[in-house]
């Protein structure tokens, strides 16, 4: 089974957590695109979706799924999204696609967070994948200096502007032993919008695509 086939298996497995007549939170990325394809098969049974990115919104609309503004929604039953890394405590690094802030907002509103990945994303310690940090443009250099003080090696992601009009610093060489503490520390830096650690609000269910099928992990 190829990596993309494992992603597809995880994406389709998430459909079992979608209830009829609900609004579904939809993340961003290659694995989520498989989930959106699956969600389209029951588009007449759900109210619609809230999307975390312009890219996912475009795909949802193309497949005939109504997309709601989050401000018009009180509650999202489930939020389905991928991860760049996830540990055994369901802490994640996300944001490789630069949609981390909107992903974090939608996750905060959702009752349950279903994380869908292939088995290459499971790690014992977060940090081998560079940690994305969304930053107000005028604060980029200051935030970079502060991230160095925290032990990281920040690199400006050239040519990338987020859906919110901000920039991304990718922080390399951080072995993140306490994700909750590090998430809070980075978010406290003036000029940071948010960072790609999802630890204070981690996943509730992890669906892992493997060569032998999909493994379901809960805490």
From Swiss-Prot:
Xref: Pfam families: Rib_5-P_isom_A
Catalytic activity: aldehydo-D-ribose 5-phosphate = D-ribulose 5-phosphate
Any GO molecular function: ribose-5-phosphate isomerase activity
Residues that bind substrate: 28-31, 81-84, 94-97, 121
Gene3D superfamilies per the UniProt record, alphabetical: 3.30.70.260, 3.40.50.1360
Role of this protein: Catalyzes the reversible conversion of ribose-5-phosphate to ribulose 5-phosphate.
Official protein name in the record: Ribose-5-phosphate isomerase A
Protein's organism: Shewanella frigidimarina (strain NCIMB 400)
Lineage: Bacteria, Pseudomonadati, Pseudomonadota, Gammaproteobacteria, Alteromonadales
